[in-house]
From Swiss-Prot:
Tissue distribution: Expressed predominantly in adult liver. Expressed in testis. Also expressed in kidney, lung and fetal liver. Low levels in heart, thyroid, adrenal gland, pancreas, ovary, prostate, skin, plasma leukocytes, bone marrow and fetal brain. Not detected in brain, spleen, colon, small intestine, skeletal muscle, stomach, placenta, salivary gland and uterus.
Zinc finger (3CxxC-type): 49-160
Recorded topology in the membrane: Single-pass type III membrane protein
PANTHER family referenced in this protein's UniProt entry, alphabetically: RECEPTOR TRANSPORTING PROTEIN, RECEPTOR-TRANSPORTING PROTEIN 3
Annotated Gene Ontology cellular component terms: cytoplasm; membrane
Residues annotated as transmembrane: 212-232
Protein role: Promotes functional cell surface expression of the bitter taste receptors TAS2R16 and TAS2R43.
Lineage: Eukaryota, Metazoa, Chordata, Craniata, Vertebrata
Subcellular location: Membrane
Protein name from the UniProt record: Receptor-transporting protein 3
Subunit structure: Interacts with TAS2R16.
A Gene Ontology BP annotation from the UniProt entry: protein targeting to membrane
Length: 232
């Protein structure tokens, strides 16, 4: 995540404040994070995404639709505090003799989608939100990719963590996201209608719960009144 860590942290906290304003959530990178290796009380969420890379030795550029982004989440109800650890797996140049593993670069749009997906998963797993999970939205790619995934130069593949290819969506040229984005993750998100606030599901769930409580109170009052009148 390099120098973009603060961007991820800020965007994540803003999204969490929209749905859980009284709870404190933090996000931090952890290069030692491994899939399916969880501490007690922790949960996992993985996304395979589209991103760009640049070799620090020869300046060669390439793109991949199979970049693994790993999240581990933990929620303490007693402290009203949650934490997320994040790892973005790297790739290396296939042309250089001794290449370094490079961090991926992501568009702002895909960063936002990744984090929205993450928040949905937190609501589902940590708060047991009673909304229906929809399918994750394919990541946006700004170029066409040809050929198989280069597993020999993929950090996740070399460590045995890579999965099959993911579905990505190409944008028309007029809607192509900026290539030089601030961050570096991409994911699979859930499809929500254009202009619809992704967190309206959580808000609707909260309203329905409050309405149910109100109805129960009204019914209880009516029963008490009837009992009192009958007794008189």
């Amino acid at each position: 995540m390099a120098g973009d860590t603060e961007v991820w942290k800020q965007m994540f906290q803003e999204l969490m404040r929209e749905v859980k304003p009284w709870h404190r959530w933090t996000l931090r990178p952890d290069k030692g994070l491994l899939p399916n290796v969880l501490k007690p009380g922790w949960m996992q969420y993985q996304q395979w995404t589209f991103a760009r890379f640049q070799c620090s030795s020869c300046s060669r550029n390439w793109a991949s639709a199979q970049v693994l982004v790993l999240f581990h989440m933990n929620w303490s109800e007693e402290k009203s505090r949650g934490q997320v650890k994040m790892r973005v797996f790297t790739q290396r140049c296939k042309k250089c003799p001794q290449p370094l593993f490079e961090d991926p670069e992501f568009t702002q749009e895909n960063i936002s989608r990744i984090l929205k997906n993450l928040v949905f998963r937190i609501l589902k797993k940590c708060y047991r939100g009673r909304f229906q999970l929809i399918e994750e939205v394919p990541m946006i790619k700004d170029i066409s990719l040809e050929g198989p995934h280069n597993s020999d130069n993929c950090e996740a593949c070399l460590q045995g963590f890579c999965a099959g290819p993911i579905q990505v969506t190409s944008l028309p040229p007029s809607q192509t996201p900026r290539v030089h984005s601030i961050y570096k993750v991409e994911e699979v998100v859930k499809p929500w209608a254009s202009g619809e606030n992704v967190y309206s599901y959580a808000c609707q769930n909260h309203i329905c719960r409050n309405l149910s409580i109100f109805c129960c109170c009204v019914i209880l009052i009516v029963i008490v009144v009837i009992v009192v009148k009958t007794a008189i």
